[in-house]
Amino acid sequence: YKRQEIGSAAAMAAPALVHLRGGTPSMMAHACAMAVKNLLGLVCDPVGGLVEVPCVKRNVIGAMDALSAAQMALAGIESRVPPDQVLDAMAEVGRSLPPSLRETGKGGLAATPFGMAYAPKEG
């Protein structure tokens, strides 16, 4: 699911950061799980049909999520929900979201008065 780009990126970055800091494979798995749980259910509602608003700012949240999850895992904190079950839940949540929130530009922020009137600048 394309709308999971931010969560998927955080889920890959968190264990990579743990690895770079000398963490164990178990810590890496828990970092991945915690990063995914923090962003589970994030919708894709691009204003104007582009990934500029609000996606660029959401990428910052994803980066901080990865850093936070890595730090927690390195500190010995583990996900209470097993990592493989977290990923299964991510897929289920993605399938459960209505089509209007699946990168169609028809729901969420894209459906606000501003979102419907927004015309991206050609450049």
Model-found features: residue ranges?
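Functionally critical mobile loop/hinge segments
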Residues: 6, 10-123
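Conserved small/polar residues in nucleotide/adenosyl-binding loops
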Residues: 1
